[in-house]
Amino acid sequence: MDNNEQNYEDFISTVSHELRTPLTSIRGFSQTMLSSWDKLDDENKKKFIKIIEQQSNRLINLIENMLAVTKLQSTNNSFIYNEIDIKPVVEQIIAIVKNQYQDQKFELNFSQNLSKVFVDKDKFQQILTNLIENSAKYSPDGGTTKIKAYTAGEQVILEVSNLGINIEEKDYEKIFTKFARIDNPLTRKVQGSGLGLYITKSLTEKMGGKISVKSVPINETESEITFTLEMPIRSIEEQARIKCNQ
């Protein structure tokens, strides 16, 4: 068996395990409600329905990430490049994420002369959504996600930071790998597929960018976690060449 076949089998095995957990919860709570509807009070009914909703959302997220991974591995995965402004894209994402994480705050800091980026808009939006949603998900209650964007030389830099539990330097690369989960008290409580950052890194690199993470302790219990996205500023000639090849 070659590496590709082994990687595919490992992927299917892990995905099957990840899918089984929410499906088991949905089936279990559905069966309980069907068999004991008259015995359950309104509070428990609402509680069970809420759990079913949460696990359904988790299942949808898993399936979307699995499809994204499959597309990444396909040689036919196409990119449609255009020059876009970052700010309206970020503002649109925040409006969506705020609806899911209503106790979280968001601070934006964009330089006045921020250059445009030459990217596939849908895939770039997926990158930013993963980073901003990830920050909100792993922030403490009432936490703040800070988003900063500026031009540095021939790069557009976008930083997404929040306060959270420290990520050790030895785990910096690990968190961008498939199905990676860093073991700490917060990640044990937060459900995730372990695919989001892998997809984010893969899409970033396919569009010529780079992504990194840094964790700086600020006290005994919290660190400032910053994900830095670097996207190249393309000249007119580079844009034309990329357009011809898409």
Task: Describe each model-derived feature in a short phrase.
Residues 1-33:
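Primarily the dimerization/phosphotransfer
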Residues 54-59:
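Short alpha-helical segment of the dimerization/phosphotransfer core of two-component systems
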Residues 70-81:
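Helix-loop junction within the histidine kinase core
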Residues 80-84, 105-115:
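Conserved catalytic submotifs in the C-terminal HATPase_c
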Residues 135-136:
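Short helix-loop "hinge" at the ATP-lid/N-box region of the Bergerat-fold HATPase_c
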Residues 167-179:
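Short conserved segment of the HATPase_c
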